[in-house]
């Protein structure tokens, strides 16, 4: 067999930001926020084809993230600025993720198989410094998960195939959602992070029929635990806090259809993406509504037209039906775009 390939890489990212907020209403408020992110990562991957039918993959990755953010709010009282201790704080966050994976690819006359397993360990430590009016708060979170994947493709006649895929995935909270700082949109709406957020864990299964390069039709199922959504909390003082939190679970199931450059005529190609998805959210016990569920149709169509040698046009549109999204219901949304193109200067310009 051919020799294997080993590659390794290291990365460093530094991000710095500063932001001032000035809110002029019945109470004048000024906020000074700054912070920085340092990210270090390294990874190594091995690909080893040890026969004509089998290829082995393995790899490891580690990353370290350090975040230090500071928010300093002052409120105008009379002729002087006074610190607002309810909104001001300092937040430090450290995260270490270590992961390793193995995967085996097998190819036979009519069957292709990919099976893998990834192990991830995450360690998080955070601290929100207090002041004379707020206590210091610190938190830690350690968790380890296994993520299996499986993909089986069976080749039929005439270039068509059947595909079965399964994968367990993780979606971690973004760093802004974990940041406990208060961001003031206006005097009635505050945005605040949540240091207690847990990652989303999902199981994804799809059975599909693939007709050459023209279209794909399938049935997909998804179960997600600890779904992260934006919640809206009324504090009773005419202020609504928008904050991310974990829901109990979400189930999504439904058929999907997609085409790729389907030729309707000699001058007209179309791409279609359509689905009918059932979403069901189970909400925490403290919500008045315990379940939010709905069937949602979605369709997107892209048409490409060619006229003679130098003229072409495009017509694109989509429609997303009424959808359940956490504790909210999103009303239908649609859009249509059109464009026309003319080649000039013997094709060197448009």
Regions found by a protein language model. Name each.
Residues 150, 292-350:
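Conserved C-terminal beta-signal and adjacent last beta-strands/turns
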Residues 25-32, 82-90, 132-139, 186-195, ...:
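Extracellular loop and loop/strand-boundary signature of outer-membrane beta-barrel proteins
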Residues 221-222, 246-320:
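Gram-negative outer-membrane beta-barrel transporters
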Residues 88-97, 141, 170-218, 223, ...:
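Outer-membrane beta-barrel signature, preferentially recognizing the C-terminal barrel domain
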Residues 1-127, 155, 215-219, 251-277, ...:
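Face-selective signature of the C-terminal outer-membrane beta-barrel domain
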Residues 16-18, 68, 77-80, 123-130, ...:
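Surface-exposed extracellular loop regions of Gram-negative outer-membrane beta-barrel proteins
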Residues 36-40, 94-98, 142-146, 201-205, ...:
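Residues that define the transmembrane beta-barrel architecture of outer-membrane proteins
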């Amino acid at each position: 067999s051919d020799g294997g390939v080993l590659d390794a890489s290291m990365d460093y990212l530094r991000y710095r930001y500063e932001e001032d907020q000035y809110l002029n209403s019945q109470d004048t408020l000024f906020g000074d926020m700054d912070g920085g992110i340092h990210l270090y990562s390294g990874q190594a991957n091995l690909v080893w084809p040890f026969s004509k039918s089998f290829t082995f993959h393995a790899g490891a990755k580690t990353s370290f993230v350090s975040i230090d953010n500071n928010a300093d709010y002052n409120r105008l009282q009379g002729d002087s600025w006074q610190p607002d201790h309810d909104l001001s704080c300092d937040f430090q966050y450290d995260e270490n993720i270590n992961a390793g994976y193995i995967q085996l690819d097998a190819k036979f006359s009519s069957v292709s198989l990919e099976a893998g397993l990834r192990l991830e360990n995450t360690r998080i430590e955070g601290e929100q410094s207090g002041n004379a009016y707020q206590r210091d708060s610190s938190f830690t979170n350690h968790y380890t998960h296994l993520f299996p994947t499986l993909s089986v493709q069976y080749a039929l006649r005439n270039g068509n195939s059947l595909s079965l895929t399964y994968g367990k995935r993780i979606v971690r909270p973004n760093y802004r959602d974990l940041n406990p700082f208060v961001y003031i949109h206006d005097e009635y709406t505050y945005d605040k992070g949540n240091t207690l957020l847990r990652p989303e864990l999902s199981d994804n299964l799809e059975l599909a029929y693939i007709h050459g390069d023209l279209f794909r039709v399938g049935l997909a199922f998804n179960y997600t635990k600890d779904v992260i959504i934006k919640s809206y909390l009324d504090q009773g003082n005419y202020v609504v806090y928008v904050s991310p939190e974990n829901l109990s679970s979400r189930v999504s199931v439904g058929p999907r259809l997609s085409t790729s450059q389907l030729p309707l005529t000699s001058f007209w190609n179309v791409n279609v993406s359509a689905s009918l998805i059932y979403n069901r959210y189970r909400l925490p016990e403290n919500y008045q509504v315990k379940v939010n569920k709905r069937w949602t149709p979605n369709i997107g169509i892209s048409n490409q037209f060619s006229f003679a040698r130098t003229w072409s046009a495009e017509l694109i549109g989509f429609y997303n039906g009424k959808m359940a999204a956490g504790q909210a219901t999103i009303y239908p949304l649609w859009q249509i775009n059109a464009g026309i193109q003319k080649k000039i200067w013997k094709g060197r310009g448009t």
